[in-house]
Amino acid sequence: MSKRAKKRDKSTVEILQVYSASRDEEQMTDLKKTDYLPYLFNLVMPKQFYKSPNRIVMARLYPDVQKHDEQAAEYFEGFQTPCFDLPTKLFPEKTPIDKIVFMPKVMLPMGFEAGGVFGPGVLPRRCYPVDLISPDHKGPMPPLFVGLRGMKVSLSSMINTFLNMYDSPDGKEPHLYEMHATNHHYENDLAPEELMLRPDFTLSVAYTLPASMCLPSPYPYPSVPEQDNIYTPDLSKVLMLMPHQFNITVAILSTVNNPHDPSVAFATMGDDEECPKFELPNDVFPICEGVNRPIFLPKRFMPKGFDACCVFKPGSLSELWYIKRIGRFGTPQEQYNCSITPPLFVGKYTRNAASINMLEEISVHFDQKARECAKSLARLRLDALRLNSRNGSTKGFLVMESDKPTTPAGAYSVESYEEASEDGCVAKVTQECATESTDTRDDGINTADYQSQFPELEPDSEPEPEPEPQTEDEGEDEGDKKCLSCFKVDSDIDLISHAIAEMGVAELSMLGEVDPVPGVDTKLALDQLHEVFETRDEIRSNIDDLMRDHVCRMERDIMLALRQPIRKCSACAKHS
């Protein structure tokens, strides 16, 4: 009893490895209707359990994290699922072992060949592993996963990097570094000359021409977080350096030098542009479907000299493929995420086109850029100094003139229209007199006919005396009462609309010159801004509907991916 009490004083763990066992490969059972069937493919065990000789692993689950997948339970009901015999010493006597629900292999954690779960409250407290539950736990017992780890576990490079990083306290993933597959030596590597002159494809080098120097934007935008679920770069400025012309060439791309371009993604989804396709050699490239399939680019986003090309997104090809097909001789490229394999370009070269002297084109490009930089260097320095002297925060966008001395919420006051123009204001809102007769708007923007709101004078009534004309000094006093307020670009649109509505009748126009922004249809821009003020609630509602539809489609695609049958490799008869 002393040992048991001493064990309870230790900090509780969530994963426990308890026993060694074996299983027949043909041992299967039918999945019956169940109330708890979670998706555990993303459940990763500590690294020590993948190397230990003990193969049975028990893990405590949390119902609010590992939730019941109702659709998967309905779909897999009646399917054959792998099972194994639980050792008699695993649980105490009279434990309801028959209530375990063995899971389909697609829902098991990585590296497990069989496993099942005890639902919430199925196991009594005396049968629950002591090390997996706190002595102060109250209520029903949490669900428990019992799995049989495979004899040989092959984890992906991303999982290995994740486990190694958390094993070492000082492990930090650098932001940029070369592809890890090129930093090690592997046996049976192809010689460089064999790799460069192989008959199936040509290994090329992707060279991105440097962009022109440009002024920094006065409106700083937050950095967009990296995402690898889609990757469609613009390769029109990329030169493919090939040792010799061949029908198909491949090249490693860089997520830093060749970032994802949303405009390319929209072009591939639409029907307006043609995306030429070609058949990839089955003996070279694996069959990738779903989110890992290659994306074929439109013609205007292809490199020079190619009839068609496609891009594999980061992480879609395995590290083993890179080792066997490219090996140590792939050109290292900078990547934002080093824990997954880099993106790959596959292009079909134009056979009838004349060869391009890439080195000469690069030299000409650099000479042209050097001349442009020399001409604009002085102007660039002056503009940069001017931008640095300004406040780094986002400045004005719309200036409003009203009689109220108080500044509206979300705005700041200025002294004159010149100051508003210097802050970047391009539009203005002014208050109109109620006697003017123009079109009426619901939100008060633009002028409106207010004479109908006043009662008509009776015929017998005497006309009111006309007000005496104001003197010049009185007119100046009235003009001094005008208050100018500026709203920023990122100001709340509801605050802007509320401030305009309080003015009653307002007119929206451009500030300053007749055509302050050359090349822009200012009238159309004002109409669009007015429409945004009017229908902002409808726009938000439509966006909410689109986001809900997107979430539903993603959940449906995930379930369809889980229901795909497991394919076997025709060469080795193993699961791919």
From Swiss-Prot:
InterPro entries: DM7 (IPR006610). SMART domains: DM7. The keyword Transferase does not apply. It comes from the Eukaryota. Residues 454-481 are annotated as: Disordered. Residues 457-478 have a biased composition (Acidic residues). The keyword rRNA processing does not apply. Keywords: Repeat. Belongs to the DM7 family. This is DM7 family protein GD16138. It comes from Drosophila simulans.
